[in-house]
Amino acid sequence: TIALSHLIFGGVLDRHPGLKICAAHGGGYLPSYVGRSDHGFAVRPEAAKIKHKPSEYLKRIYFDSLVYAPEGLRHLIEEVGAAHILLGTDYPFDMGAYEPHKFLAAVPGLTEQQREQILGGNAARLLGIDAGATSRV
């Protein structure tokens, strides 16, 4: 949360519009409370140095899916879109998701297209990998 806030409010994303960032653990606190950052942008002069509201920058950041609660991932998808969520496992740490595909199955309202994006389509697109190439090996 703190690192992402520094990247946003420090103008890094304005200076480097093509920068690709992936935030662990769903970006922590920030996506759930980006309204607070947007409010700060509107009322604090030192925060108004960036070009857009913080919520607009969130849509340029990728987030892993490891948020531990299906409802939390549903909310993250609403905030940033499924196209910016990558499968997260936290491997090799013991707090990780051993069967992340089962976690995705528990997310309310997740469509098959969104599930496929999160399971690997988004990572392939982000990394410039032909997702169909592995099926031809």
Language model regions located:
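Mid-to-C-terminal alpha-helical segments outside catalytic/metal-binding sites
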Residues: 19, 29, 63, 67-86, ...
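Catalytic pocket-lining loop regions of alpha/beta-barrel enzymes
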Residues: 1-84, 137
